[in-house]
């Protein structure tokens, strides 16, 4: 959500490549220690940073599938940062695995 709301279109391969390249050039991917994982209530570039449950916002399942497909992203721990309590969080974790399976994403 943070990057997406800032204008990085992580729903497209080119957008993820651009974001990863910028991170590498600014401070190095090896220094990126975690990713907050959540969908966005608002469209790309809205600069509002309002979180939504996985697959229920403007990033959507297909967008997450693109993002999850990058090995660089897979190597960094993901911290779920979605609205709700334990039950909703468990459903969101399940949704992440469903997206990985549905889109046949190879995971290291």
From Swiss-Prot:
Record: residues binding Zn(2+) 2: 36, 81
GO MF terms held by the record: deoxyribonuclease IV (phage-T4-induced) activity; DNA binding; DNA-(apurinic or apyrimidinic site) endonuclease activity; phosphoric diester hydrolase activity; zinc ion binding
Residues that hold Zn(2+) 3 according to the record: 2, 49, 51
EC number(s) stated in the UniProt entry for this protein: 3.1.21.2
Transmembrane region(s): none
Textual note on the cofactor: Binds 3 Zn(2+) ions.
Domain of life: Bacteria
Requisite cofactors: Zn(2+)
GO biological process assignments: base-excision repair
A Pfam cross-reference name: AP_endonuc_2
Keywords, ordered alphabetically: DNA damage, DNA repair, Endonuclease, Hydrolase, Metal-binding, Nuclease, Zinc
InterPro entries assigned to the protein according to its UniProt record, in alphabetical order: AP_endonuc_2, AP_endonuc_F2_Zn_BS, Xyl_isomerase-like_sf, Xyl_isomerase-like_TIM-brl
Catalysed reactions, semicolon-separated: Endonucleolytic cleavage to 5'-phosphooligonucleotide end-products
Family, similarity comment: Belongs to the AP endonuclease 2 family.
Free-text function comment from the UniProt entry: Endonuclease IV plays a role in DNA repair. It cleaves phosphodiester bonds at apurinic or apyrimidinic (AP) sites, generating a 3'-hydroxyl group and a 5'-terminal sugar phosphate.
Name of the protein this chain belongs to: Probable endonuclease 4
